[in-house]
UniProtKB/Swiss-Prot annotation:
This is Histone H1. Residues 26-97 form the H15 domain. One of its GO terms (biological process) is chromosome condensation. Could act as an H1-type linker histone. PANTHER family: HISTONE 24-RELATED, HISTONE H1.
């Protein structure tokens, strides 16, 4: 027994073999490969699954289980809101629009120290308005009666045109009667005859000179 234990102690314990460093992955994560494929293809309505797979296989070294890993990565990305399939699970794939980062809250501008307010000049007391003399009920009644009386008065008649004054008729002058010696009555003419116009005097002839003998 003692010999066995001594031999065991004599043999040094075997060192654990150093671990081999893990092989570096030959491609980035499937999420990154999907994102790069969609970005590079630049299709407006999204890229089809076949186009994305073809891009990944031609640019990265993938293993045999590529299809399984591709489908799982796509499903997880849709659930997390990283990818969008507008036409359903078998349709095209698009990148989800990133929401704009919330704008940083603006710092409130430091308020300037308010200048001390000047004491407002005391306003002059407004002069009390004269109370309007209340109209008595009697005055109101008189006004109403006057309005009614004015409404009842008929419109004034037009002034009658002045009558034309007849021109006075001239009476004939009384006829004067005269008696002649023989007793006959004669009527004197009342109308005065116009005085006969005097003939213009004929011009005097110039005296002829006497002939000399």
């Amino acid at each position: 027994m003692a010999a066995a234990t001594a031999s065991a102690a004599a043999t040094p314990a075997k060192k654990a073999a150093p671990k081999k460093p893990a092989a570096a992955p030959e491609h980035p994560s499937y999420k990154e490969m999907l994102t790069k494929a969609i970005t590079e293809l630049k299709e407006r309505n999204g890229s089809s699954r076949q186009a994305i797979k073809k891009f990944i296989q031609s640019n990265f070294k993938v293993k045999d289980n590529f299809d399984v890993q591709f489908n799982q990565a796509l499903r997880r990305g849709v659930e997390k809101g990283e990818f969008v399939q507008p036409k359903g699970p078998s349709g095209t794939v698009k990148l989800a629009k990133k929401e704009k980062a919330a704008a940083a809250p603006k710092k409130p501008a430091a308020k300037k120290a308010a200048a001390p307010k000047k004491d407002a000049a005391p306003k002059k007391a407004a002069a009390p308005k004269k109370a309007a003399a209340p109209k008595s009920a009697a005055a109101k009644k008189k006004l109403l009666d006057a309005k009614k009386a004015a409404a009842k008065k008929p419109a004034a008649k037009k002034a009658a045109a002045p009558k034309k004054v007849a021109a006075p008729v001239e009476k004939p002058a009384p006829v004067k009667t005269t008696t002649t010696k023989s007793g006959r009555v004669t009527k004197a003419s009342t109308t005065s005859k116009p005085a006969p116009k005097k003939k213009a005097a004929a011009p005097k002839k110039a005296a002829t000179p006497a002939k000399s003998s």
